[in-house]
Amino acid sequence: LPASSGAAEAPASVPMATLAPTNALKARANDDAALRRAILSTERDVVVEMAGGSEGLVRAVPMASLGAGSQAFMAQYGVQYPLYTGAMAKGIASADMVIAAGLKGMLASLGAGGLPLHRVTAALDKIQAALGVDKMPFAVNLIHAPADEGLESGGVELFLKRQVRIVEASAFMKLTPWIVRYRVCGLERGAGGKTIAKNKVIFKVSRTELAELAMRPPPADIVAKLLKQG
């Protein structure tokens, strides 16, 4: 808004702040930091001061530089925007969709559920040719298939072989050896003994107890069995 909006033109000696609502946030059009603070404070009015109090276009600050949304999400998944497109099964969330989102700094999940492994492999070929191997982040869907364990185990082995770092896990009612294997295979010991988990799992859950299960450490007996198997 121009500083003179809704008021008579002020003399040059009158401070600009006196023309704004008393509880409004002020930001000059050429001050990125002030614009960021003002725009993110959505509960208060924002008055943008133009040069000389005149009307004109205000330069929009790119969303990425505003830092809007979850900073933790962006840091956790290495993306520029806190935006995530979930997996739509049978390739509806296609390789092209994953690539388009990834190149724009968003996280997208390949809809691998319901696809044979050779089609998932072909999709990974296309995605990693565009986004790189273990470079620009993307996810792949893994659906729990109790009637056909080979689908789940084959998917996990493929993801480990191809260095897929994010899996979107669907329809899991419990933690299985295969989803635990994917997670623990990416564990490393970092500086100062800190545990680093390269492989991340996004659980799609429908009940709070399933969310709690996903947040717990993996069952010790499953981990022990996996270690025994090498």
Which residues fall in each region the model found?
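Active-site entrance/lid segments in N-terminal catalytic domains of soluble metabolic enzymes
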Residues: 6-230
